[in-house]
Each structure stands twice: as structure tokens, then as C-alpha cells.
From Swiss-Prot:
Active-site residues, as the UniProt record annotates them: K71, S146, S170
Single Gene Ontology MF annotation: hydrolase activity
GO terms for biological process, alphabetical: auxin biosynthetic process
Origin species: Pseudomonas syringae pv. syringae
Top EC class for this record: hydrolase
Keywords noted in UniProt: Auxin biosynthesis, Hydrolase
Any Pfam family the entry gives: Amidase
Protein name: Indoleacetamide hydrolase
InterPro entries, alphabetized: Amidase, Amidase_CS, Amidase_dom, AS_sf
Known pathway: Plant hormone metabolism; auxin biosynthesis
Keyword Hydrolase: yes
Family annotation (SUPFAM superfamilies): Amidase signature (AS) enzymes
Record family assignment: Belongs to the amidase family.
Amino acid sequence: MREMITLESLCRALADEQIAAEELRERALDTEARLTLLNCFIREGDAVSQFGEADQARKGTSLWGVPVSFKDNICVRGLPLTAGTRGMSGFIADQDAAIVSQLKALGAVVAGKNNMHELSFGVTSINPHWGAVGNPVAPGYCAGGSSGGSAAAVASGIVPLSVGTDTGGSIRIPAAFCGITGFRPTTGRLSTAGIIPVSHTKDCVGLLTRTAGDAEFVYGLLSGKQQSFPLNRTGPCRIGLPVSMWSDLDGEVERACINALSLLRKTGFEFVEIDDADIVELNQTLTFTVPLYEFFADFAQSLLSLGWKHGIHHIFAQVDDANVKGIINHHLGEGAIKPAHYLSSLQNGELLKRKMDELFARHHIKLLGYPTVPCRVPHLDHADRPEFFSQAIRNTDLASNAMLPSITIPVGPEGRLPVGLSFDAPRARDAFLLSNVSLIEKVLKG
């Protein structure tokens, strides 16, 4: 699959029978078998039996025969659903999540379920029960999380598309660490029905692909706005650079991102620094309060709707990740967030959305641009530090709290650790964001 230039070209090759869907399936299985040490799939059973086959009745649909994997907090009928935690081992989903149904209707083949950070509560995908997800492009280094298995499956060439979830950066962080594209749509644009949640306010279904062009292609199909000709592009645009997000950067991250801006500037893109101090202060009031308050009710309600019989304490008692266990125990006890504090944070969320609208308008900018993660990809031996979580989501969490569409693309130099550069657009401007970042991607690739 890696020799296929774009996902659209792969779909065309399948439709024209230049490649057989079964051949594509066998290639993916062979690649996974060679790369089992990546731990990017959760397989309760053999891979062959859990890897679907192209539905001949759907031949002619847009994604017919394309293998797609799903983070293991997403329901796929007949496959295990563990949310990356030992306490749910053996549970089989009896329904498809809405996003799975959509992709199946487009002809996609379910390749399996991806490993993840336990219960989505982290950014490393170092999973004590299922194994740490390896980084295919930087062996020995962290794959990121919580959708780390999805990023690794795409980056290694097992699948061209994976579906993950993003609460505060859980798609974009692993995409940046694995040198691929991660797209979080405007919150609510893709249904979260059939997904084990962290926070109904912040959770978002999104896409992990090799390129921004691939993400644009798939999102167009999912949103029903796919066209047979390129979207009208506005050309180079004015992009805001939030000062806080460009501060205290690792040297390699800073160099890679500044080099990318320099290339874009030469082709007509305009950049302006944005003083975002008031935005940062407001954003910090939502980062942990909202998801940690909502998780316990949302998680329990989700399990009940899926037919779980054992209660949430059966799961919590078997949590293996020490950091996750600490968070859960703290917030079930003395650290429980008060309802008034939660409601205040929700009000701040509405204020944040208004302030972001004003920021785009006041500075006459079309996009925001910033390094996806301020630090370099950590080695696996050093990634599981509690303080790394806050560092990793420092830049990505604003888009989550303001419900903006956001995408990261790789800009790191060949042969060095991956670096991601992110772009956000105003809410509901998903197609505009994807179109412009696809253009940016082409400029950067020369």
C-alpha cells in the first residue's frame, strides 16, 4: 500500500481492478505479521479471523476494499471492545459505532482494533496489559496517544486509514510522533455514537492518514460533500501564530516548524504573531475539569448502553496503568470535582468559543498555525512520566476546548525524529481547513 501515492489513487486502482481487494488484504496481514512487535493491534484471537473481507455487494462504492482499522474504544460488531483495559478483556461488541457503519457503507474493510492508552487516559499508548505501542518510524521511541495504535498502523503501512478519538489531542499527538496526518473535525461533525467516551463535551471522532490530501478525500466522503473536481482553493492565506504555542520549544521542533513557515512564506502565505495570553488563561480552566467530571457518568452510561453487566468498579479495580489508576482513585475520592466548578468551566467554554471567533476576525486570519507538540518525541523509557501529559497536550487542547477543526502534518527532516505542525480553522470550516492544508502539504513537499 505504501507505493500508492494517495488513498484516492488506491480506491481508483481497486475500482479499475488494477489491484484485487484480497491482495490488499493479504498484504496488510503480511505487514502486520512482520511487525507484531509494534503492538498496534489488540487481537483477542488470530488476525486473519478478525480482518474482514471486501463485501461484493458494495463493489463500486467509494472506499470498496480499503482496509480501515479502529481504535479499541470504538464498537465494531463481532470484535472485542476493551478500551485498552484488562477489565474489559473478552467483551464483544454487538453493534457497530456510527462511524463504522458509515465506512462499511462506503465499502471499507474492517482491519481490526488498535491498541491505545488505557481508557484513553494518556498520551503514550504504553499499555501495561496489551503492550506498549511501538513507533514504526522511530524505533524505541513513543508512538503517542491515546490513539497510538491507530497512528502506528498507518505509519507502518498496514492500513492507509485508521479512525481514532481525540479529547485533548489523542489523534494529533500520535500522528505527530509517528510522522503522519491526524485530523480532528469540528466537535460533533462525526457521530460519537457507539464509542466508549471520556467526555461528551470534548470527545471527537477523527482520522489518521498518511497525508492531508487523504484526510480531505475521506472526510469529503463522510460528510457527503465529496466532489469529482478539486475544491476551490483560496491560495496562500493569512495565518496566525499564537505566541504561547511557539514558546519554550525543543530546538529540533522549533527548527523544523520555522523551516516549514519559511517555505510557505516564499509562496505567498502571510504569518502574523497573535498575543493569546487571555485565551491561554481561559483555556486552562477547561483542560482537566470538564473531562474528569464527565468521565465517570459518561463511561458508566456508555457501558450500560452496550450491555455491560459487571459495573464500572469491576473495570477500575483492574486498571494496570499506575497514572490512570491514580487519576481515577483521586477523582473518585477527595479530588472529586464539585458541580459548581464544572458548570463554571462549561460557561468558560462558551466564552472561549466567542473569544476564538473574535480572534480570527480581529486579526483577519484564516488559520492558526503552531507546533503540534512543543517537545521532541520521547524515548519509551522516559515517556511515562506524569508531567509529560500536560506538556504533550499544551498546544493541542485549545482546539478541543474551543471545538475547532484541527489537523497536524509532518514537517520533520528525513532521518530525524518526527515533528508535527498543526493548523486550526474556525468552527465548521472543516472543508476549508483540509483544502488549505492539502495545499500547504504540496508546497512543503515541493
